[in-house]
Amino acid sequence: MSSSSGVPESWIASFCSLLGHEYFAEVSEEFIEDDFNLTGLQTQVAMYKEALEMILDVEPEDDDDEEEEDEEDEEDMSGGDGINKPHGERRHHSRIASDLSVIESSAEMLYGLIHQRFICSRAGIQQMSEKYELGHFGICPRTNCNQTRTLPVGLSDTPGEDTVKLFCPSCLDVYVPPNSRFQTVDGAFFGRTFGALFLMTFPEYDLTKTGAESVSNLTRSGSDDTTVINGMYARNIAPGLGRGKIYQPKIYGFKVSEIARSGPRMQWLRSKPDDLSVLDEARRYAEQQGSDDEDESMGVSSRTASRRRGPPRRQKQNGSPMAIEQNGAESEL
């Protein structure tokens, strides 16, 4: 495949431009050529070497094909068996076609597994952040999230278990992509680590912005609410949850009873404490460790003081080696 400028398009660019592959980032060839980044993938992908060569646009070696063509020419010149020749050619070409289809599927699988690792690297997550700012991953379908941008994630790191899902950082829920063309994308190509790592890498993103607004930087916007809890800004912790953000089903203005068969269920999943400081596990851990250290130091000091009590009896007797006790009375020689 070639681009409009006449320069042949790489396999990676062609793969990412396919319909339904809009979530993918273009993995750099430097990342793929580093053997450390491919550790453990040889056993997961069939025809690993050929698939890797296809991804890197490396031309396969044609030595075997040339030898077979030379042998066929020699058979023609020597008047070999011409009856079996067409059948052999058909079998040879069918084998080549089947190998290409297997290599193509293996290349897609291998690229997906490499992509899972690449988007967790510095260069890969920066690429995904640019796509996130442009809204390439879509928005949350929940009304109270106000069109918060979503992130592609997988529910498993093992290929073939589930398709890609969209994680909303506003309501902390996972949704199926709205378009059916994404239902063929394996969720393992994005993995379970990317979503949390993205939010920890870019904590300054203002998640309260809607999909139509640009993602601003909390540190540059001069926001007063810059309280940090567990490494994240407090206003970015599930802004779509809590009081006033829980849907209440009503019929003609009357709330549907919770004990009704069609009543609301599991609304506690949308709840959030009013005081977010109770979620600050890092602060509580530091305080607990500090109190434990104080108790331990006090225990050590008390044990040291107890050891210092009861000096030797010789010191009470002015250290005289000639002082002895006889029947409870002291005498000197």
From Swiss-Prot:
> Has keyword Phosphoprotein?
yes
What does its PTM field state?
A: Phosphorylated by alpha subunit.
GO molecular function terms listed in the Swiss-Prot or TrEMBL record: protein kinase regulator activity
Q: Where is this region: Disordered?
A: 58-92, 282-333
Q: Which domain of life is it from?
A: Eukaryota
Known partners and oligomeric status? Tetramer composed of two alpha chains, one beta chain and one beta' chain.
According to its UniProt entry, the function of this protein is described as:
Regulatory subunit of casein kinase II/CK2. As part of the kinase complex regulates the basal catalytic activity of the alpha subunit a constitutively active serine/threonine-protein kinase that phosphorylates a large number of substrates containing acidic residues C-terminal to the phosphorylated serine or threonine.
Protein known as: Casein kinase II subunit beta-1
Its lineage reads: Eukaryota, Fungi, Dikarya, Ascomycota, Pezizomycotina
